[in-house]
Amino acid sequence: MNGNVYLSPTVVQWLLPETVVAAAATLILVLAAFLRGRAAWWWLAGASLAVSALLLAGQTPQAQNLGPVAADSLAIYFRYTTLALGALFLMIFARSVNPAQSGEIVAMLLYMISGTMLVAGSDELVLLFLGLELVSIPTYVLLYLGRHDVASQESAAKYFFLSILSSAVLLYGFSFLYGISGSTQLTTIAETLRARAADQSSWHILGGLALVMIFAGLGFRIAAVPFHFYAPDVYQGTTNGNAALMAVIPKVVGFAALIRVTTLAMPTLETYGWRLALILALLTMTVGNVLALWQDNLRRLFAYSSIANAGYMLIGIAAAFAVNLQTGTPGALNGVDAAVFYLVIYSLATIGTFAVFTWLGSRERPVEHVSDLEGVGRTHPISGIMLAVFMFSLAGIPPLAGFWGKFEVFFAALGVREAQDASVAGLGNWFVFLVIVGALNAAIAAAYYLRLIGVAYFKPARASLKGEGGLAAFTAGVVAAVLTVVIGLAPGPLLNKADAVLTPLDAGQNIPSAEVPAGDQVVQAQP
């Protein structure tokens, strides 16, 4: 692709929200070298998110993609989600980090937010990979800055090397896609694969290899089994704030990329796709939930919780592949919208949980073990209520938001049996089995989530927790708890937004790109 296409006025205007956040990060990083320990960095970061949200509010889904940019409902949904979650993270980190490092930490947070937004709106492999690296590189820095003991440095190094490996595997998968289609633009790749669907040449094998490598590369980011093994050690070796960040942002960016590159750009490879996603969902749910039962370290427990919840989201991806997005049938749309709806619900509950942990502890005495929560429901009643809300939601107990999240992904899987295509409907038994395993996993998960509530309310109180994590972290917990309850009682608005993320335009139709200035057109090789 000619680099000048990124400078066309329409592309620049569409990318302004991401640009504002990245520019603020760069400004803070430069100034922090001369002005140390300034609280102003947090306010400047918050202001950049607010300005970005205002710019985003002026954007609407376009009838055409803008060159390398996907100007669709899915991009807008993910970008709003990222900004909202980013604001909560700023509140959690505000008092829990070393003031001398606040400039660097704020800047890294903003770069991660900008990168996630960039991936969500990418219609081009190079731009998408750039966004992924804009998330990964700041993550290395944050893990290094979080703590300075041996365990922390070991976990940071482990994540660094494995992340590099996953990026290499992902790029290898992208190279196969380029070789098959002759283009790096996702809509062109989808059109090429659709045009060659009846061709029984070796491209199907190459496409299958590309799909496996892309799932492997992105599976690392979403912590799907068997690419999950770094997560428990990395979460345990870092701070509560960093653990929350690791549990949420890589999943948001990972699923945004997975939806873009697989279910939207490679819908004709559903023969491989639904099987691969279904197997990953089964393994990820089961391994995550079973291993979480034996954990005493809270960050390690929520690492396995994060793994298990990635499995539930993969149910939606599997359903989308099974129905095949190019047909535009409701089941396919339900698969993707169920996944993105569940992603928001999971993110709120996880961020809220770590906000409570941050509030209850301090930099010197963080909340780390299950026993640290003993009696919290009596010594810190509001924190106990918030913790109960988040645990009930993660367990999928009505009427909280988590119930609707699980309901949506299970409903999407069962919807495969109702597909108009008889060959697709015949796959329904596999998805019934998937839902049964998912329900059993939900029961297993309830055991360790409800265990935390039992410890908080039915164990003798500990006097060691003073609630010194800062008002901002407490406020983040309250906001997340209120949203979890409100969405649970009235899920309609968020469900409608999730339902709208894939219009017929996005769902595999012939999507032209908006015109860009002469000489700036996408350069495509002949397949």
Q: What is each model feature region?
A:
Residues 1-527:
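Alpha-helical transmembrane segments of multi-pass membrane proteins predominantly involved
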